[in-house]
Design a protein with these regions (language model features):
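Accessory terminal helices/loops
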Residues: 13-23, 206-207, 211, 220-287
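Conserved beta-strand hairpin/beta-sheet module of binuclear metal-dependent hydrolase folds
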Residues: 30-75, 162-166, 170-174
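Active-site metal-binding motif and surrounding structural segment of the metallo-beta-lactamase
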Residues: 32, 55-59, 67-110
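Metallo-beta-lactamase
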Residues: 57-59, 65-67, 140, 147, ...
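Divalent-metal coordination cores built from histidine and acidic residues
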Residues: 94-154, 160-162, 206-213, 251
Length: 287
């Protein structure tokens, strides 16, 4: 009898979970911010979307969650009624590729080779949601009057990270290799690396053209100033955890000791201070 009651409760919870999930997105508004030239940034729920909207049509960088796709499409039409031609993925996570199946019916999906491999391994991922054009190192598109460069970077957030440079507008979309003003996630199971994060950001700071505007994977539109702060946080917090590991401290002890006060405001509901310390601890212990 008890087992039967449990089974009934589980049956009732499935649609409830789906309803709650739908409600999570019910009040999400997609907002557009003009960045420079033909480039815009869309915010909503999930990773920031980069947009090139001009005479050749529309190109998007990332596309958030599947339930938001119609609203994202409506926001794109307000910027430019022209057709969607290209869909770029900075990496494989669902808050950046959730709309692939929807937008993949309209434009060609382009991403690093490992994005297709990892998305292809996901149960239920339809073929239309997979990248149809892949690259290993870099790729250029000539679209809306400028060269748009996709460059794969060494493992940082994942093993399939790319940054997108709108060369004419002088705008760079970093995907999740840059979280502005907050702790990032490191997908250790997906090939991510704290050492790669630090090196990639240090290299980017040296190469960024003067006056460039930066679209982070998460957080507000930024400049190299915020990128430098992000790099400083990565270096300082990783050193704190590295010293704790060298001293034989456990993860719990390291979390209880915490981080310098200056980084308290970088915690977010998704990546709390304790979670960030855990990611650092696991990543640095594995070297």
């Amino acid at each position: 009898m008890a087992l039967r009651i449990v089974a009934i409760l589980l049956t009732l919870l499935v649609p409830l979970k789906a309803t709650l999930s739908a409600q999570d997105f019910a009040n999400v508004a997609i907002k557009a911010v003009h960045v420079a030239g033909n480039v815009y940034m869309l915010t909503g729920s999930g990773g920031n979307i980069g947009v090139s909207a001009g005479p050749d049509g529309v190109l998007i960088v990332d596309n958030q969650f599947a339930p938001l796709a119609p609203r994202i499409e409506a926001a794109l039409k307000e910027l430019n009624p022209g057709p969607l031609k290209f869909v770029l993925n900075t990496h494989y996570h669902g808050d950046h590729t959730g709309g692939n199946a929807y937008f993949g019916r309209q434009g060609h999906i382009i991403a690093h080779t490992n994005v297709r491999k990892r998305l292809g391994g996901k149960p239920g991922e339809t073929k239309v949601g997979l990248p149809v054009i892949t690259f290993d190192d870099s790729l250029s598109l000539h679209f809306n009057g400028e060269e748009i460069k996709l460059v794969h970077v060494p493992p940082a957030h994942t093993d399939n990270d790319s940054v997108v440079h709108f060369t004419g507008a002088n705008v760079i979309h970093f995907g999740d290799t840059f979280f502005s003003g907050r702790f990032p996630n490191i997908d250790l199971g997906g090939g991510g690396s704290i050492h790669g994060y630090i090196k990639n950001i240090a290299d980017a700071i040296e190469r960024i053209p003067p006056g460039a505007k930066l679209i982070p994977g998460h957080g507000p539109l930024s400049t190299v100033k915020e990128l430098r702060e992000f790099h400083e946080m990565l270096v300082e917090t990783s050193r704190v955890v590295e010293k704790a590991i060298a001293a034989g401290k456990s993860l719990k002890e390291t979390q209880e000791a915490g981080l310098p006060d200056r980084w308290k405001s970088w915690a977010a509901p998704t990546i709390t201070t304790a979670r960030w310390i855990e990611l650092l601890y696991r990543g640095l212990s594995a070297k």
